[in-house]
C-alpha cells in the first residue's frame, strides 16, 4: 500500500482539520439516522393501517432539515455555534439560550474524527486511496455510536459501505478485487452460519442481521485474508466489553462497535503487522 502514496507535510494536518469538520456532521448523522428509521417505520405502519399522521410525523426530517437546534429550548443553533470544538469551549459547554448543558460527547466525536483522519493520512499519504480511508473511517465512527446507542446498524449505511469497498478495490486500491468480493461473501456467510448454529442449539438469536452486513462491508474493504484477524480481534474486544458492561451497568453489549474498532485498526495497521497475526492464527503451533 505504501508504494501508492506520497507523504506530504500538509496531508496529516489538512486531513485532521477536515476530520474536525466531518465530525461535526457525524454528530448529526449519529442522532438523526435512528430517528429517521423509527419515523419511517411509524409512517409506513400508519399509512398501511390508514391511520392519520401527526403534524410532527408529516414534517420533513432528514440529515439536512430541520435546522439543528437545542433539544430543550428548540432555539436554532447559529453558524458560529457549530465550529468544531471551539464553539463548545466558547459556550463553556452550555446552550447559548437556555444554558442547558451540552454533552461532552459532541466535541469528543469531532476530536476523534480529526485524530483518526490524521492517522489515515499519515498511513496512506497524499493519494486518491486516502479518500477511501477517510470515507471508511467516517462510516465506522457513525456506525459505532449508532449501534452503541440504539443497537441498530442501518442498511442505509452498511449496504453502501459494501459497494464503496468494492469500488475502491476495483483496481486493487487496498486489496485485489477478487479478495474484496470473497471477503464480502465470506464475511456475511461466516457470521450468518455461526448465528444459525447458535440459534439451532439454544433457540436464541445471537446477533442481528446488521452485524452480518457490517462484516461483509469490512470484508469488501480489507479482503478475505483479513477476516481471521478481524473475527479474532473483534471477539476479544467484544468479550471484554460485554463483561465490563454487564458487571458495571447490567446492559447487553452491541457487537457492532467491536467489529468497527477492530476493522479500523486492521485497516490502518502496517501490512506486516496484521499479516503476521493472520499467519499466527492460521498456522497452529506444533
UniProtKB/Swiss-Prot annotation:
Intrachain S-S bonds: none
Cell compartments where the protein resides: Cell inner membrane
The reaction(s) this protein catalyses: Typically cleaves a -Gly-|-Phe- bond to release an N-terminal, basic peptide of 5-8 residues from type IV prepilin, and then N-methylates the new N-terminal amino group, the methyl donor being S-adenosyl-L-methionine
Entry-linked Pfam families: A24_N_bact (PF06750), Peptidase_A24 (PF01478)
A molecular function GO annotation: methyltransferase activity
Keywords: Cell inner membrane, Cell membrane, Hydrolase, Membrane, Metal-binding, Methyltransferase, Multifunctional enzyme, Protease, S-adenosyl-L-methionine, Transferase, Transmembrane, Transmembrane helix, Zinc
InterPro entries: Peptidase_A24A_bac (IPR014032), Prepilin_IV_endopep_pep (IPR000045), Prepilin_pept_A24_N (IPR010627), Prepilin_peptidase/N-MTase (IPR050882)
Biological-process GO terms, alphabetical: methylation; signal peptide processing
Entry's EC annotation: 3.4.23.43, 2.1.1.-
Cofactor(s) in the UniProt record: Zn(2+)
Cofactor binding notes: Zinc is required for the N-terminal methylation of the mature pilin, but not for signal peptide cleavage.
GO CC aspect terms: plasma membrane
Binding site for Zn(2+): 70, 73, 95, 98
Keyword Hydrolase: yes
Membrane spanning residue stretches: 10-30, 102-122, 126-146, 157-177, 181-201, 224-244, 250-270
UniProt membrane topology term: Multi-pass membrane protein
Protein purpose: Plays an essential role in type IV pili and type II pseudopili formation by proteolytically removing the leader sequence from substrate proteins and subsequently monomethylating the alpha-amino group of the newly exposed N-terminal phenylalanine.
Family, as annotated: Belongs to the peptidase A24 family.
Designated name of the protein: Prepilin leader peptidase/N-methyltransferase
Species for this entry: Neisseria gonorrhoeae
Lineage: Bacteria, Pseudomonadati, Pseudomonadota, Betaproteobacteria, Neisseriales
Gene name in the database record: pilD
